[in-house]
Amino acid sequence: MTILLNTIFILFIGIWFVRFFVEMDVPEKYRVSRFFQNTTDYKGEGLTKKDVLRILFLAFLIRVLIYFASVLIYLVQSDFLSHAAAFSWNDFFNLWNKSDAQHYLAEKGYVNCTEVTEWSGREEHLFLVFFPLYPWFIRFFHFFVNSYAVAAFAVSIISFCVGCVFFYGAVKEEYGASIAEKSLTLLLLYPFSFFFGGIMTESLFFCLISAGFFYIRRHKWLIVGLIGLLASLCRIQGVILLGVGIVEFLISSQLIRMIQEGQFKGFLKYFFTEAVWLFLIPIGNLVYLGLNYQITGNAFQFTVYQKNHWYHTTTWFTNCVAEIMRYISGQVSDTTLLIWYPELILFVVAAALLLYSLRTQPLKYSAYLLVYTLINYSVTFLISGGRYMLNAIPLFFFTAALLNKHKLLYQLLCFASALLYGICFTAFLTGGAIY
């Protein structure tokens, strides 16, 4: 299995780069084969004000309905009559105060947020593993509301609603309205998308990545750089926008043609006046490393905590997949059904869609999906893969494009996703193995 996966990976990388050079306008006589040329020609459509208002309303309505559903599920699985009258905001908060939601740093900050650990025997700044942007946003909103919990929900709700607009806009301008509608529907029905409403980074990161894609499509490089900087302050994967932006810049500027025509100096001028803004993006990661260094004296202290407290060490993706398969082959439990099977299925789906994308999808999106998936599947003891892959957003682009002319298959997928959503959401609210 390891040899097969590595072989497929190497072949994919090789074919991807050949197509990349072809799309930078390699002269016809140098092209290896028509196989490496894009076989699709999607007709994008502009995002309208009506689209913006409609998607904002839809996203907000969905968040309200999901929160209402969470209360109903809580009341149904408990003694409905004895709990309904006494149900309070604190009860609602506790429904969503699970997994990483309990660890955010808005109130205490990194310095004052410590725990005594068994492996060191002293207080450690364990929560340095969490990036700072989401807590900073919560702290900002706390100026306007009295509760950190309310501030956190406000950040998540606003980020989700705005993110849906950028998501829809990016897909519509690239693929057209039909695929945009299907992509958004698949995203909303993704079995782990309820995490968008929690006190976690999912919604904020989703908003920033979607906005990054939207402005990369429009070649607004300064805006992309600023958004990417925020994204890399939100999660380490935010830095991927740098690669996505460079891919789009090099393809759109037709680098090889410019070299062939003796316009390399013109390209350099264009690069250093426009694309140079993309290099703002890694600053977010550097700020995070600086926080680690300032607090502990080690810029990579978060990796120590990940290893010793959360049992995460960096590994090659094939080792992660092999570990998941070993867990699946063991005794069946809720962990097997809610963590390991979904993670294996998601990996297979992502790999299949990447292969499908080689000749059919924009390279910037396949580059993001490949690197994002590799990062997520390059750790040991991956227990939150379903949640992490929520922001592998080209998954939804590619699936919608693939099923755009297959109405029955699309409807079956929507039905299956909705069913699994209900199962996973209920498990999350009732203490199941959903992280």
Predicted regions located by residue number:
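Membrane-interface transmembrane helices that cradle and orient dolichyl/undecaprenyl
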Residues: 172-178, 212-223, 253, 403
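Signature aromatic-anchored transmembrane alpha helix within multi-pass, membrane-resident enzymes
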Residues: 278-282, 405-434
